[in-house]
């Protein structure tokens, strides 16, 4: 039996099923009236008393059953409250564990990051030491070169004395400027040549593409001419076919209108049976068919349930 609150009819049905067969057996065991005591009135009073006692017993059992069901309902509600409290406690515990895991993960990430930074700093320090050694070696190499280039410095000093320049760095700057200008001119010439080559390549591709397009257009023109000739030769056939299509479309349109009208009539009948306002548009045939189908399905389910109950009554 369900733990929910039972209706009076359900309780009556339950007690009828539980005690009806037992009462029938007890009644069958009763002695025949013809073979009973000579005082039928006394016998009837005794049986009436037994019937009242049995009725009171059934009423008491019914009350006890109702109280038991109420107790079970209360226990069920208490279990629901305890279950909700347990779920809340589990959720809080999971949230607390998740927060601790997140803190632990952040701490581990921070420690890993600090170790990585320390390792990077050590690598950077080693790299700087190596660069310092390399710079010292470069300084020694440049110092040696400076001694080797001392003769060239003397030569440049003489050049300054016999030219328009006043300092050696002006001569060097002028030389660097001329070298840079020569490099720029050569680069510009190379870029110009590359542009010319690219333009030639684009022109060749353009000419080739246009030749291909002309050939494709000629082929397309020939194909369209053939299609035009075939269409012109079959114009009578297609005109008759078009007339047939129009006639068929008119019949289909008439049939569709008939179907929509019949569907609308059925929908209005269903709406009257349902006794409720529907917001279905008159032209929404699909929605109307859906509601008609649902109405038929509901009535079929009701009829099946009625037949099932009738069969149960027949068995009882």
Curated annotation (Swiss-Prot):
Cellular compartment(s): Cytoplasm, Perinuclear region; Cytoplasm, Cytoskeleton; Cell projection, Cilium, Flagellum; Cytoplasm, Cytoskeleton, Microtubule organizing center, Centrosome
Highest taxon in the source lineage: Eukaryota
One Pfam assignment: DUF4200
Similarity section: Belongs to the CFAP73 family.
Function: Essential for male fertility. Required for sperm development.
Subunit structure: Interacts with ODF1 and ODF2. Interacts with CCDC38. Interacts with CCDC146. Interacts with CFAP53.
Protein name according to UniProt: Coiled-coil domain-containing protein 42
Native source organism of the sequence: Homo sapiens
High-level lineage: Eukaryota, Metazoa, Chordata, Craniata, Vertebrata
């Amino acid at each position: 039996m369900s733990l929910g609150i039972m209706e009076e009819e359900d309780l009556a049905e339950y007690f009828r099923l539980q005690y009806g067969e037992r009462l029938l057996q007890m009644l069958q065991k009763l002695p025949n009236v013809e073979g009973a005591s000579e005082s039928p009135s006394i016998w009837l009073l005794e049986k009436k008393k037994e019937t009242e006692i049995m009725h009171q017993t059934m009423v008491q059992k019914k009350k006890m059953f109702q109280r038991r069901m109420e107790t079970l309902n209360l226990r069920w509600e208490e279990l629901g409250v305890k279950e909700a409290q347990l779920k809340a406690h589990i959720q809080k515990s999971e949230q607390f564990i998740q927060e601790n895991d997140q803190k632990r993960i952040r701490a581990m990430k921070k420690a890993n990051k600090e170790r990585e930074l320390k390792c990077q700093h050590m690598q950077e320090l080693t790299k700087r030491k190596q660069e310092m050694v390399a710079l010292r070696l470069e300084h020694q190499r440049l110092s040696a070169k400076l001694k080797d280039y001392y003769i060239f410095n003397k030569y440049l000093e003489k050049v300054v004395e016999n030219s328009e320049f006043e300092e050696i760095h002006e001569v060097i700057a002028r030389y660097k400027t001329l070298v840079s200008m020569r490099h720029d001119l050569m680069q510009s010439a190379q870029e110009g040549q590359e542009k010319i080559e690219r333009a030639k390549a684009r022109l060749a591709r353009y000419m080739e593409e246009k030749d291909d397009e002309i050939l494709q257009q000629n082929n397309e023109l020939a194909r369209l001419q053939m299609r035009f000739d075939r269409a012109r030769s079959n114009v009578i056939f297609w005109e008759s076919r078009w007339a047939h299509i129009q006639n068929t479309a008119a019949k289909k349109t008439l049939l569709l209108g008939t179907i929509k009208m019949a569907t609308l009539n059925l929908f209005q009948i269903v709406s009257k049976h349902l006794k409720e306002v529907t917001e279905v548009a008159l032209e929404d045939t699909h929605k109307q068919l859906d509601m008609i189908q649902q109405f038929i399905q509901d009535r079929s389910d009701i009829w099946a349930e009625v037949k099932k109950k009738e069969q149960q009554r027949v068995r009882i």
